[in-house]
Amino acid sequence: MTNKTWGGRFKKSLDSSVNQFNASLSFDHVLFDQDINGSQVHVKQLAKQKILTEAECQEIYSALEEIRTEIKQGQYSFNERDEEDIHMFIEQLLIQKIGDLGKKLHTGRSRNDQVALDLRLYTRDKGCLINELLTRLIDCLDDLTSKHQQDLMPGYTHLQQAQPVTLGAYFNAYQCMFSRDKSRLEDWFKRMNYSPLGAGALAGSTLPLDREWVAESLGFAGIIPNTLDAVSDRDFVIELCSVAAMIMMHLSRLCEDLILWSTQEFNFVTLDDAFATGSSLMPNKKNPDVPELIRGKSGRVYGHLMAILTVMKGLPLAYNKDMQEDKEGLFDTINTIIVCLQMITPFLQSLTFNTPLMRTKAQSGYLDATAILESLVMKGMPFRDAHHQVGAWIAEAIEKQCSLNELLKGG
């Protein structure tokens, strides 16, 4: 018999290398707050259903709160423990504090529904924070839209000057993109906010559990009715990672423009000293590290999305140990998108835009060609003929080194 909580049927101790390979405490300890919240509601339910006494419930509840405080105060080193994961870590601390009563905590529960609950609570908490940060970014873009609604600049396709737009319209485009991202995040929240607790390992429990009461107590919209589904899917993790990848894609595109605009060749934007870095060799340099890092970090978020999709694609129902691999990528995705959103808003607010140069560029370079084409169409000329005619005028203007308006007025 081993000293593991699940070791009753085993005659040999777990090989130390397997124990180390199997462990996830070094990274899943970030779930401690959610794990304790879930356990506290679970024991209150056990008392409500007369499976535990009120006195037992209160003693377990209070001891769990003490453990939460001790973890927050840094009293434990997660890298020096033998427990497999944060769930076993907290349970063992509980048993050390209150003895055999602590062994009743896991009554009516499996780690399968326990970890599914913890992940839903964790992603819900972090999803709310991401939503708040998105709102701040959208508000910032709205301010920039209003501030620059009259400031002309060149619009680009293929990174070539195309038609005049306003700087305000540019920022409004990203405001629209991030608003859709916010909508996606809120849609995800509606789908994921259901409780798996009470699903057990895969087939529920013979104990008279009240799953609906637990769900309501933890702020869920309801329960996941199918217990197999409750413990076996991580689509809510995948969907959050997908939304995060979309947000990072939009952030990366925004940053790409700002990086280009900050070059001497464009000179559309000046970086604030507080949000730029220098070179260890070249004293003339002022580098856009903030947007470059955000652009670069998009790759790791994409990678984590592909990783969890690949982990899940071939798993039979219900739970499999493969699913432990959902966490590190999820945690890094969340941490990455939070820090990027925290940086981008003050970075945008710090920028100085060279609007006179933008206007000059918008009024040169034949950006008025499409408007002239359409004026010919309005006079009755077929579109293709008008397109050909304006193209010929542009070729002539380039040869004469004058603007299109100057050419037409001279003609």
Curated annotation (Swiss-Prot):
From which domain of life does this come?
A: Bacteria
- Protein species of origin: Legionella pneumophila subsp. pneumophila (strain Philadelphia 1 / ATCC 33152 / DSM 7513)
Name the UniProt key words of this record, in alphabetical order.
Amino-acid biosynthesis, Arginine biosynthesis, Cytoplasm, Lyase
UniProt lists the family membership as follows: Belongs to the lyase 1 family. Argininosuccinate lyase subfamily.
Q: Does the keyword Cytoplasm apply?
A: yes
Q: Pfam families in the record, alphabetically?
A: ASL_C2 (PF14698), Lyase_1 (PF00206)
GO BP terms, alphabetized: arginine biosynthetic process via ornithine; L-arginine biosynthetic process
Give one GO molecular function term.
Answer: argininosuccinate lyase activity
Name of the protein this chain belongs to: Argininosuccinate lyase
